[in-house]
Amino acid sequence: MISNQQQKDLKKRAAFKKLNVAMNSYVELLFLSVPLIHIFKWLGSLALHLIH
């Protein structure tokens, strides 16, 4: 009975850890993509200035 409960808790913890890792990597990707977006915007505006 106790071991069964412990297994359930372990499964919950493992799922929570996976979710946590996914959230952390998602946030890191967001922080990384923000400067990339700015760089692409800057390159786009530079290209427009060069074309006109």
From Swiss-Prot:
- Keyword Transmembrane included in the entry's annotation: yes
Sorted alphabetically, the keyword list is:
Cell membrane, Membrane, Transmembrane, Transmembrane helix
Question: Could you give one GO CC term from the UniProt record?
Answer: plasma membrane
* TM region(s), chain numbering: 21-40
Topology relative to the membrane: Single-pass membrane protein
Give the UniProt subcellular location, in the record's own words.
Cell membrane
Q: Could you identify this protein by its name? A: Uncharacterized membrane protein YdzJ
Upper lineage is: Bacteria, Bacillati, Bacillota, Bacilli, Bacillales
